[in-house]
Amino acid sequence: MDGDRSKRDSYWSTSPGGSTTKLVSDSERSGKVDTWLLILAFTQWALSIATVIICIVIAARQGYSMERYSMTVEALNTSNKEVKESLTSLIRQEVITRAANIQSSVQTGIPVLLNKNSRDVIRLIEKSCNRQELTQLCDSTIAVHHAEGIAPLEPHSFWRCPAGEPYLSSDPEVSLLPGPSLLSGSTTISGCVRLPSLSIGEAIYAYSSNLITQGCADIGKSYQVLQLGYISLNSDMFPDLNPVVSHTYDINDNRKSCSVVATGTRGYQLCSMPIVDERTDYSSDGIEDLVLDILDLKGRTKSHRYSNSEIDLDHPFSALYPSVGSGIATEGSLIFLGYGGLTTPLQGDTKCRIQGCQQVSQDTCNEALKITWLGGKQVVSVLIQVNDYLSERPRIRVTTIPITQNYLGAEGRLLKLGDQVYIYTRSSGWHSQLQIGVLDVSHPLTISWTPHEALSRPGNEDCNWYNTCPKECISGVYTDAYPLSPDAANVATVTLYANTSRVNPTIMYSNTTNIINMLRIKDVQLEAAYTTTSCITHFGKGYCFHIIEINQKSLNTLQPMLFKTSIPKLCKAES
C-alpha cells in the first residue's frame, strides 16, 4: 500500500509535461470562499437598500400623482356641473321661448292662415267647378260607385253565348230574390206615393216618386222626393239599391209627372208644375211651367224653372208633360220623353191597322189621336232636349215625334243602352199591345217598333187587353218593359195581367209571341197601378229591379214596392 501511495503522490507532483505543480492547501481554499461570500452578501444588501430607496421614491411620486388626479377629477366635476347648469338654463330659456311662440301660433297665427287658405281653396274649387269642362272632374271627387262588375244591362253584350244561341227559359220558374227595400214612403195613413221613376247610370242611380199627403188625386198638393244611390251586393250576393242622398222638394211647388236621368255623379229631374187640372190645361193655349232639378251626392240642389215663352217649341202646345219614365244623357244634352196636346193638329197618317177590322180606314186612326175628353186636342209624343245641362242656365228645346212614326202620345221611357236608344210608350189608345222599339234621334226622327203579340195591358171595355182595332179611346196603364235582346224582341216587364181591371201584377219574361216565364206577385185580386222594370248585369249575370205601385187595400192607398228577379236566360247548345 505504501508503494501505491508513493506512486499516487508522484502522479500529483509531476505534470504530464514533466513540470512540477504546487498543490493549494484546504485552509487557503476556504479563505477565498469566505471572501466571495462576503462580497456577495454586501452586494445583496446594497441592492436591497437601493430597491427600498427606489420604492420610496416611486411611492412618493405616486402619492403626488394621485393627489393631482383627485384634484383634476374634482375640477372636471365642478366644470361639468357648471356646463350642465348653463346648458339647462339655456335650454329652459329656449324651450320657454319656443313654447310661447308655438302657443301663439296655434291660438292665433295658424287658424288665421288656415282660414285664409281654406277660403282660397274654396274659391278656386268653386271657380273651377263652375266651368263646364271641369264639372265632371269636380264631381269625380265623390267616391260613390256601383259595386265592381255591376252595370246597366246592355242587350248587345248580354244577349249572346260562348257557344249556341241565347233564349229565355221557362224552367225553373222565376222567384223573388231577398234583400231590403229603401224606397221613400209616406208618414200618414192616407198618404199616396205615385209615379216611380228609376234611372240606372254607369256610376249611380236616381229614383224619384211623388208623395200626395191626402189621397191619390193628381192635382193634389204633393212632395217630390229625389234619391241618389249606388247598387251594392248583399250577403246573398244579390244586388240592392242603396240610397246615399235624398232631397224632398217643397209641397207648395206641386211637382207632377217627373222623369229622371242619372249621369256622372248627379241626378236630373224634369217635372211639370201645374196650377190647373189636366183637362183644364188641355183646353187652354200654352203649357204649364217646367222645372229642371239637379241633385248631387253632397246633397246640393239647384232648380231651373221655365215658362212657356222660355222653351223652344217646334209647334204651339196647349199642354205638355214629362213622360214619368227615365230619360237619357247624351254628349252635352239630356233627353226626356214627353207627351201633350198640340194647339193645331199636324197633318199626316199615323200608325194604323186596317186588316181584320171592320169599317176602319186610315182616317179612323188619324182621328183617334184627337181625344174628346182632352178638348179634342191631337195628343203626340215629344223629345224634350235639355241642352248645355252643365251650364248656369240650360236651354230646353221640344221636338215633336212625327205622327207617322207613332201611336197616341202617352207616358213612356227612353233607354240608351250601348249605341242604341230604346223607346217605350204606354198603350193609352186603341193599340193595346206592348209598344217598344228602337229610336233614331237623327233627323228625321224614326222609330222601329218591335211587334209584341203576347204582352198587353188592361183597359176600358172598348180598349181592353185584346183590342187591336182602331178607335178613339184613352185608357191603359204605364207598365214599361226592358229590352234584353238588341231588337227588343225579348223583354222583362211587370204586367197587370187582366182584361179591364188594374189587378194581378205579374213579373213576365217574354218574347214577341209567348210569355216564357212569369211570377204572380200575390193573387189575381191584388190591386196595382204603374210598374217600371230596370235591369243590370253583374259580371254577365242578369238581374232586374221591378217597382210596382201596390194598392194597400186596407188603407186604400198606393205605395211603390221593390222586387228583384234573376233573368232566366240560357244558352241553346248547337246541334
Curated annotation (Swiss-Prot):
It is found in: Virion membrane; Host cell membrane. InterPro entries: Hemagglutn-neuramid (IPR016285), Hemagglutn/HN (IPR000665), Sialidase_sf (IPR036278). Coiled coil: none annotated. Residues 59-575 are virion surface. It is an enzyme of class 3 (hydrolase). Residues 1-37 are intravirion. GO terms for cellular component: host cell plasma membrane; membrane; viral envelope; virion membrane. Residues 254-259 are annotated as: Involved in neuraminidase activity. Its EC number is 3.2.1.18. The keyword Protein biosynthesis does not apply. GO terms for biological process: symbiont entry into host cell; virion attachment to host cell. Glycans are attached at N77, N499, N511. GO terms for molecular function: exo-alpha-sialidase activity; host cell surface receptor binding. It catalyses: Hydrolysis of alpha-(2->3)-, alpha-(2->6)-, alpha-(2->8)- glycosidic linkages of terminal sialic acid residues in oligosaccharides, glycoproteins, glycolipids, colominic acid and synthetic substrates. Attaches the virus to sialic acid-containing cell receptors and thereby initiating infection. Binding of HN protein to the receptor induces a conformational change that allows the F protein to trigger virion/cell membranes fusion. Neuraminidase activity ensures the efficient spread of the virus by dissociating the mature virions from the neuraminic acid containing glycoproteins. This is Hemagglutinin-neuraminidase. It comes from Sendai virus (strain Ohita) (SeV). The gene is HN.
